[in-house]
Curated annotation (Swiss-Prot):
Coiled coil: none
Active site: H178
EC number: 1.1.1.27
Protein name: L-lactate dehydrogenase
Task performed by this protein: Catalyzes the conversion of lactate to pyruvate.
Record flagged with keyword rRNA-binding: no
Species the sequence originates in: Borreliella burgdorferi (strain ATCC 35210 / DSM 4680 / CIP 102532 / B31) (Borrelia burgdorferi)
Pfam families listed in its UniProt record: Ldh_1_C, Ldh_1_N
GO annotations of cellular component type: cytosol
HAMAP family per the UniProt record, alphabetical: Lactate_dehydrog (MF_00488)
Phosphoprotein keyword on record: yes
Cell compartment(s), UniProt: Cytoplasm
Amino acid sequence: MLKSNKVVLIGAGGVGSSFAYALTIDNSLVHELVIIDVNENKAKGEVMDLNHGQMFLKKNINVLFGTYKDCANADIVVITAGLNQKPGETRLDLVDKNSKIFKDIITNVVSSGFDGIFVVASNPVDIMTYVTMKYSKFPIHKVIGTGTILDTSRLRYFLSDHFNVNTQNIHSYIMGEHGDSSFATWDETKIAMKPLSEYLAEGKITELELDEIHKKVVNAAYEVIKLKGATYYAIGLGIKNIVNAIIGDQNVILPISSYINGQYGGLIKDIYIGAPAIVCKEGVKEVLNFKISPKELDKFNSSANQLKSYIDKMEF
């Protein structure tokens, strides 16, 4: 049960501040946003900057600088803290560094008395979501990662650009790791009510073009990092959507880091990985176990095994 429509953000870097900004300009539900960062001056500066724009908002939100004590009565704790991916690094290169940072963060949050929902955005997000669940000992439905929400948004953007239709009419997902081993659910993709297979048959898109689109999705982060140093606007919007889905009890389907334990053929167990799930005020209401093609299932298992190889080396 939601208590106060209060969100605590841990991490005032590019991703965290982008989420905070997105939340303030598109807010109808959150009453209070508290920002925590190891760099207290950075957090205080973000709070000041956001508050100075209150006159321009449709609905004011109380933005405050805080400490871990402020997590006690929060509904949601969003974690964007941790080291960022550098040029040439994969997200999985950050496992050891960020898992150590997370142990301290999660311990402090839980010690405050927090019993709400964790939303994790730090990379590698699927593993960091699992780490959060293990360190917090929270029920799996109360620990959510951003998963492939950004990958899916990128996919729908590229498809909408190709077909010249609104992204809202593109129905497709990226599943698996938020990273290089992800895959697109082409066999289940529809443009409005029309299956992608029909567009292929009509010659309006080719298998080669689909492969190129998926490559663009996978390489998007590397390209943005090369050009501007980091990605943060789009994922900030994605986090905002997850938070609003929880606060607003939207029961919306989002491709998040979902806890998989036997779904999708039974081979994937005890892991968080990108898969569509219903998100509501309780966190994850249900991880959808829809049918995907054997080829896609093989890719899902392969992606999960890659993540599992890192998790199995960790001690909790």
